[in-house]
Amino acid sequence: MRVNVTLACTECGDRNYITTKNKRNNPERVEMKKFCSRENKQTLHRETK
């Protein structure tokens, strides 16, 4: 079962991206390096509730 998750920048807190994940294969929170337009660089983005 795939669910939509929101990714938030760990440095500025902006919620920049929406993606999907499979809860059965990835029960923990998703972390990805993505581009943050406010920081103007690649930062770590984590799944929010």
Curated annotation (Swiss-Prot):
Keywords of this entry: Ribonucleoprotein, Ribosomal protein
GO MF terms here are: structural constituent of ribosome
A GO cellular component annotation here is: ribosome
Q: Sorted alphabetically, which Gene3D superfamilies does this protein's record hold? A: Ribosomal protein L33
Q: Which GO terms describe its biological process?
A: translation
Q: Which InterPro entries match?
A: Ribosomal_bL33, Ribosomal_bL33_CS, Ribosomal_bL33_sf, Ribosomal_zn-bd
What family is reported? Belongs to the bacterial ribosomal protein bL33 family.
Identification of the protein by name: Large ribosomal subunit protein bL33B
Q: Which organism is it from?
A: Staphylococcus aureus (strain NCTC 8325 / PS 47)
